[in-house]
């Protein structure tokens, strides 16, 4: 079960969190999650953290974050790279290990500094005798480029939209609602249960407290988004406004055996249910969250109508629209407090963020079923059922 969790505010690309590494952010989230759970670091038996952009991050980013968070040196850690699925897969793996009897208490989550992703110089080890050399953007190539079709994932999504036929207006309206819902959630204090402020040192004077997601624009409307140019094709429908933001952040949860939590007298947010993992038939993204949700709820033994809370990562508006339609659910149940279009999408973090948010939303409601799902690079999808 998920006992508690915490996340940093999400920073924009080269924004307020640009000077924090992924491991710095991960440590902040882990430390805060332990505090919220009222669990001492000495009780943690294993740490699993997702991170996608690891070039230049140093060995074992998960272990770096764990040690920086005060978790003892004799506690092992595992770094996961399953692209956008990394954070949710970390939680699912933690659940599986606990069910297998390997551990009782695991920290799981995801961390990412997209701002600090370096540029790479391929073939530099063998040297360049003459002429120019080309730098490769680690962020773009290893984070946002579909290797199977050799194009940006946005272009791939645009290509699939020729089949799905979601209009520019539909995507702009969805994106605007994401911002409006997220802004309203912040105003109503919804995110206060999950976000821990980050103290940012200044050259002079006291540190600044960075406390709210940086990318949310409360005044965003479909009309204002209509003025943006297509991002991936001249006649395309996807813009920077209907795609998730490139961002920095981290999230962590405390996953614990139920008997252990009861022994310690702890409350919990939600029990972890079935996990759905899907892939194919190609590298497109739109159907993957829906496919993963269908697999997970079938394993859980429930129907889609029994889901009270549905979190679908907004990699693109087209993905959330397609998966919502394929599930046949009321759109009002999906991403009730906004999503990655407004909040941002630090790729290693997002799976953990939406799982934590779904658990907290379920706890606020008192009972029911929730599911968190994402698409992932290479045409994969993960979903995790939560119940209370």
Swiss-Prot record:
E.C. code: 2.3.1.9
Active site: 84, 345, 375
Keyword terms, alphabetized: Acyltransferase, Isopeptide bond, Transferase, Ubl conjugation
Catalytic reactions of this protein: 2 acetyl-CoA = acetoacetyl-CoA + CoA
Enzyme class: transferase
Cited Gene3D superfamilies: 3.40.47.10
Entries under InterPro entries matching the protein: Thiolase (IPR002155), Thiolase-like (IPR016039), Thiolase_acyl_enz_int_AS (IPR020615), Thiolase_AS (IPR020610), Thiolase_C (IPR020617), Thiolase_CS (IPR020613), Thiolase_N (IPR020616)
Domain of life: Bacteria
Molecular functions (GO terms): acetyl-CoA C-acetyltransferase activity
Pfam families: Thiolase_C (PF02803), Thiolase_N (PF00108)
Chain residue numbers at which the record places covalent cross-link Isoglutamyl lysine isopeptide (Lys-Gln) (interchain with Q-Cter in protein Pup): 187
Family matches, as SUPFAM superfamilies: Thiolase-like (SSF53901)
PANTHER family membership: ACETYL-COA ACETYLTRANSFERASE, CYTOSOLIC (PTHR18919:SF107), ACETYL-COA C-ACYLTRANSFERASE (PTHR18919)
UniProt-listed NCBIfam families: AcCoA-C-Actrans
Assigned protein family: Belongs to the thiolase-like superfamily. Thiolase family.
Protein name, entry field: Probable acetyl-CoA acetyltransferase
Annotated source species: Mycolicibacterium smegmatis (strain ATCC 700084 / mc(2)155) (Mycobacterium smegmatis)
């Amino acid at each position: 079960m998920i006992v508690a969790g915490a996340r940093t505010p999400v920073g924009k690309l080269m924004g307020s969190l640009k000077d924090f590494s992924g491991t710095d952010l991960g440590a902040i989230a882990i430390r805060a999650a332990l505090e919220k759970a009222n669990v001492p670091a000495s009780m943690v038996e294993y740490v699993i953290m997702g991170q996608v952009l690891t070039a230049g991050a140093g060995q074992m980013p998960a272990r770096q974050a764990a040690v920086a968070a005060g978790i003892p040196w004799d506690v092992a850690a595992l770094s996961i790279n399953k692209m956008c699925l990394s954070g949710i897969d970390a939680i699912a793996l933690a659940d599986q290990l606990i069910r297998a009897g390997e551990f009782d208490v695991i920290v799981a989550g995801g961390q990412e500094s997209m701002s600090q992703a370096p540029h790479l110089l391929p073939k530099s080890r063998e040297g360049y005798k003459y002429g120019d050399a080309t730098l490769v953007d680690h962020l773009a190539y290893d984070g946002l480029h579909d290797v199977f079709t050799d194009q940006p994932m946005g272009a791939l999504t645009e290509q699939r939209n020729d089949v799905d036929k979601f209009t520019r207006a539909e995507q702009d309206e969805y994106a605007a609602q994401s911002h409006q819902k997220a802004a309203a959630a912040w105003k109503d204090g919804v995110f206060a249960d999950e976000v821990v402020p980050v103290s940012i040192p200044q050259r002079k004077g006291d540190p600044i407290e960075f406390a709210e997601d940086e990318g949310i624009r409360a005044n965003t409307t479909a009309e204002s988004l209509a003025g943006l140019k297509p991002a991936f094709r001249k006649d395309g429908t996807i813009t920077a406004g209907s795609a998730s933001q490139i961002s920095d952040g981290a999230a962590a949860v405390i996953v614990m055996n139920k008997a252990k939590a009861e022994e310690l007298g702890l409350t919990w947010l939600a029990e972890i249910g079935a996990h759905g993992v899907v892939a194919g038939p190609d590298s497109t993204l739109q159907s993957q969250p829906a496919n993963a949700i269908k697999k997970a709820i079938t394993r859980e033994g429930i129907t889609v109508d029994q889901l009270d809370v549905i979190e679908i990562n907004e990699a693109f508006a087209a993905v959330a629209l397609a998966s919502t339609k394929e599930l046949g659910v009321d759109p009002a149940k999906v991403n009730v407090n906004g999503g990655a279009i407004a909040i941002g999408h630090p790729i290693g973090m997002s799976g953990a963020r939406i799982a934590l948010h779904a658990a907290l939303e379920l706890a606020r409601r008192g009972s029911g079923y929730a599911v968190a799902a994402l698409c992932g690079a290479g045409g994969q999808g993960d979903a995790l059922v939560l119940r209370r």
